[in-house]
Amino acid sequence: MSKKYDAGVKEYRDTYWTPDYVPLDTDLLACFKCTGQEGVPKEEVAAAVAAESSTGTWSTVWSELLTDLDFYKGRCYRIEDVPGDKEAFYAFIAYPLDLFEEGSITNVLTSLVGNVFGFKALRHLRLEDIRFPIAFIKCCAGPPNGIAVERDRMNKYGRPLLGCTIKPKLGLSGKNYGRVVYECLRGGLDFTKDDENINSQPFQRWQNRFEFVAEAIKLAEQETGERKGHYLNVTANTPEEMYERAEFAKELNQPIIMHDFITGGFTANTGLSKWCRANGMLLHIHRAMHAVIDRHPKHGIHFRVLAKCLRLSGGDQLHTGTVVGKLEGDRQTTLGYIDQLRESFVPEDRSRGNFFDQDWGSMPGVFAVASGGIHVWHMPALVAIFGDDSVLQFGGGTHGHPWGSAAGAAANRVALEACVKARNAGREIEKESRDILMEAGKHSPELAIALETWKEIKFEFDTVDKLDVQ
């Protein structure tokens, strides 16, 4: 007997609230933090999110009979209270994998964080976490190189990498920009970096910057005997211009380029990552605009989701905040999404904000980049928090040295090596940080001056987006 079509409107929970459902290994799972309008039951709010992010619409439609709606629909299978919040709750939703184009992060986000975020029944909605099934991960190319390959390319092992953003980030001519790059690299840094908003402005066209940077790197490598690099930002107004800049960096024999993945978009980022893999280029990723999306504790997308999506889309390095610097991010939350960038399997751990087990299979890892308001006094904590597979970037903490950028770079290099040596000797570098740094400063006038210069600089503000734990 054929199905009967009943026109009209019915409650979402009649179809999309399925508390008896057991998620499949192939399902894509999502955790949303929901705050509904007053008087709307939690089950109806959660079911509405499942419906509007999958197969649902506001009215029953006859064309539902032309497909197997029960197979394709998203299902809210669990609701949990948010600790310490009387209004919000977690909705756990399972989506069949066939709802998404293979390997397309753009398509996944269009469904999960599309029109549903403007739904009137919701006051706030936040995507807290996604469990990508291994079947989907295998369709994504991921990082173009990964941690091990990058270390081999740069010939750097056994410690975090050191970098800095060129300052002032806007206004320098190409030649003066190259001079600052040279000073930093000869002083001891591994990388220097374009800031996120340096593209091709009237004061410095991109070709000019690329050429002077390439010359600076060549001189610094000859002087130090080390492999050096600079993150050349190829983010552009069109994909064609982006690839033109990437090709020119390759012609100059540069090891690494950079992309602003949120403002540039996931489609552009995935394409650029594939280009980097095919052309032997490392890819540094900046997260400009992320806080607009992830900082509000009740609305938006948590950064752990953006970090997971970036690993799938492709990038070899990603900014993650610092814990100790000027940018938002507490220690446990930051460690949670650093794990998602680097590990092959990350277990559910609410104390770090991870709502699901996440199996990454054999996908390469991504370097976590600590950048934003850090200086030499932060070095012991940074080494302890981020470990070796990280890039520690000191912008003002390099250029602000009273003796200039080369001295600032030297101070950071000495501090880093002192902390790594102390850690390897079994010392508790966070507890013994002052002794370790002061001892190293006795043999490095650059470090001694840096320690004196920044001894009073702290960024002691409470975190806005805190973990929801009891």
Swiss-Prot record:
<keyword id="KW-0602">Photosynthesis</keyword>
<dbReference type="InterPro" id="IPR036422">
    <property type="entry name" value="RuBisCO_lsu_N_sf"/>
</dbReference>
<feature type="binding site">
    <location>
        <position position="371"/>
    </location>
    <ligand>
        <name>substrate</name>
    </ligand>
</feature>
<feature type="binding site">
    <location>
        <position position="165"/>
    </location>
    <ligand>
        <name>substrate</name>
    </ligand>
</feature>
<dbReference type="InterPro" id="IPR033966">
    <property type="entry name" value="RuBisCO"/>
</dbReference>
<feature type="binding site">
    <location>
        <position position="319"/>
    </location>
    <ligand>
        <name>substrate</name>
    </ligand>
</feature>
<protein>
    <recommendedName>
        <fullName>Ribulose bisphosphate carboxylase large chain</fullName>
        <ecNumber>4.1.1.39</ecNumber>
    </recommendedName>
</protein>
<dbReference type="InterPro" id="IPR000685">
    <property type="entry name" value="RuBisCO_lsu_C"/>
</dbReference>
<dbReference type="Pfam" id="PF00016">
    <property type="entry name" value="RuBisCO_large"/>
</dbReference>
<keyword id="KW-0503">Monooxygenase</keyword>
<keyword id="KW-1282">Carboxysome</keyword>
<keyword id="KW-0560">Oxidoreductase</keyword>
<feature type="modified residue" description="N6-carboxylysine">
    <location>
        <position position="193"/>
    </location>
</feature>
<feature type="binding site" description="via carbamate group">
    <location>
        <position position="193"/>
    </location>
    <ligand>
        <name>Mg(2+)</name>
    </ligand>
</feature>
<dbReference type="InterPro" id="IPR020878">
    <property type="entry name" value="RuBisCo_large_chain_AS"/>
</dbReference>
<feature type="active site" description="Proton acceptor">
    <location>
        <position position="286"/>
    </location>
</feature>
<dbReference type="GO" id="GO:0016984">
    <property type="term" value="F:ribulose-bisphosphate carboxylase activity"/>
</dbReference>
<comment type="similarity">
    <text>Belongs to the RuBisCO large chain family. Type I subfamily.</text>
</comment>
<keyword id="KW-0479">Metal-binding</keyword>
<feature type="binding site">
    <location>
        <position position="287"/>
    </location>
    <ligand>
        <name>substrate</name>
    </ligand>
</feature>
<keyword id="KW-1283">Bacterial microcompartment</keyword>
<dbReference type="InterPro" id="IPR017443">
    <property type="entry name" value="RuBisCO_lsu_fd_N"/>
</dbReference>
<feature type="active site" description="Proton acceptor">
    <location>
        <position position="167"/>
    </location>
</feature>
<feature type="site" description="Transition state stabilizer">
    <location>
        <position position="326"/>
    </location>
</feature>
<feature type="binding site">
    <location>
        <position position="169"/>
    </location>
    <ligand>
        <name>substrate</name>
    </ligand>
</feature>
<comment type="subunit">
    <text>Heterohexadecamer of 8 large chains and 8 small chains.</text>
</comment>
<keyword id="KW-0456">Lyase</keyword>
<dbReference type="GO" id="GO:0004497">
    <property type="term" value="F:monooxygenase activity"/>
</dbReference>
<comment type="function">
    <text>RuBisCO catalyzes two reactions: the carboxylation of D-ribulose 1,5-bisphosphate, the primary event in carbon dioxide fixation, as well as the oxidative fragmentation of the pentose substrate in the photorespiration process. Both reactions occur simultaneously and in competition at the same active site.</text>
</comment>
<keyword id="KW-0113">Calvin cycle</keyword>
<dbReference type="GO" id="GO:0009853">
    <property type="term" value="P:photorespiration"/>
</dbReference>
<dbReference type="GO" id="GO:0031470">
    <property type="term" value="C:carboxysome"/>
</dbReference>
<dbReference type="Pfam" id="PF02788">
    <property type="entry name" value="RuBisCO_large_N"/>
</dbReference>
<keyword id="KW-0120">Carbon dioxide fixation</keyword>
<dbReference type="InterPro" id="IPR036376">
    <property type="entry name" value="RuBisCO_lsu_C_sf"/>
</dbReference>
<dbReference type="GO" id="GO:0000287">
    <property type="term" value="F:magnesium ion binding"/>
</dbReference>
<feature type="binding site">
    <location>
        <position position="196"/>
    </location>
    <ligand>
        <name>Mg(2+)</name>
    </ligand>
</feature>
<feature type="binding site">
    <location>
        <position position="195"/>
    </location>
    <ligand>
        <name>Mg(2+)</name>
    </ligand>
</feature>
<dbReference type="InterPro" id="IPR020888">
    <property type="entry name" value="RuBisCO_lsuI"/>
</dbReference>
<feature type="binding site" description="in homodimeric partner">
    <location>
        <position position="115"/>
    </location>
    <ligand>
        <name>substrate</name>
    </ligand>
</feature>
<keyword id="KW-0601">Photorespiration</keyword>
<keyword id="KW-0460">Magnesium</keyword>
